[in-house]
Swiss-Prot record:
Disulfide bonding pattern of the chain: C104-C200
Name of the protein: tRNA-specific 2-thiouridylase MnmA
UniProt site (Interaction with tRNA): H129, Q342
Active-site residues, record numbering mapped to chain: C104 (nucleophile), C200 (cysteine persulfide intermediate)
Domain of life where this protein originates: Bacteria
Family as reported in the entry's similarity comment: Belongs to the MnmA/TRMU family.
Class of this enzyme: transferase
Main location: cytoplasm
A matching Pfam family: tRNA_Me_trans_M
Interaction with target base in tRNA: annotated span: 99-101
Amino acid sequence: MEKRPEDTRVVVGMSGGVDSSVAALLLKEQGYDVIGIFMKNWDDTDENGFCTATEDYEDVIRVCNQIGIPYYAVNFEKQYYEKVFQYFLDEYKAGRTPNPDVLCNKEIKFKAFLEHALSLGADYLATGHYARVDRSGGKVRMLRGIDENKDQTYFLNQLTEDTLSKVMFPIGELQKSRVREIAKEAELATATKKDSTGICFIGERNFKTFLSQYLPAQPGDMMTMDGEVKGRHDGLMYYTIGQRHGLGIGGSGEPWFAVGKDLEKNILYVDQGFHNPLLYSDKITATNISWVRSDIMKGEEISCTAKFRYRQEDHKVTVRMTGEGEAEVIFDEQVRAVTPGQAVVFYDGEECLGGGTIDDVYKDGTKLWYV
């Protein structure tokens, strides 16, 4: 039998933003025994000694005092550096475009932090993610958030039913606009705070400047597949397949896009046209395949839909397992700018089935020059 809310301890991961603030407020109003915990994963003190984490923690303190719940901070900087940031650098070094948020959720928020919460006697860990957990029928399923524009299951694709059985997403049933309203009605300190964007450890800083501190850039030629040099690139790691901005190629005609990379020769391939055939593929291989429920992949393959980047429409695909955690994903129709290193995430209607990491990209049986 389930415990009553007042006998159920929920640790809320609080970032200092409006979403996690409202998540904590709703749980408190529902009668749960709530503790707010701020996670520090990165030392982001800038050259002027300003640290956004300090400001965020102060907002957490204000909100927790308003709601009337205890709070404190935990530090996962070491784990984050080893498990997430090192991977981020290695992927860029390999010419790929990683998604650190997926790994942060898998290794830090819903592993290291979840273990910490359970050690405090918590029954559940709650976060301000826009996603839902369905516990009906004796199964644990992850569903998209009600707000389609904010749904974050893409970044949560590596979570399993075991983890999700201990997780709550209190705002997953709400529209973002309603979350803001609730915060304003309760006069929470974070009610009008703007949403954070971008990668957490880069913050508002320039991406190129940040990356160059860790990886020396190697400029090289930008050329067409026919070998016509169109300019110089600043370093392959700064460009992603399908990128238009920052190429600096002038002239008439359609805009230019990054359509391929040659890591060995340090060449960035470019061509004109948003719908350039070089940007389209029909199959990928994927690694790190993880299914939310153990009963999803019963046979060799399943038909479902997939997203190859956040906020992209769903595409019909067939997923064929080829080894432990490895799969071939065949598209019903060609898809534009599928990028190695990014997440591929599988869906069946509202349900997020799981996902993996895009490895190689193919078209008509030929591997494309995407890394």
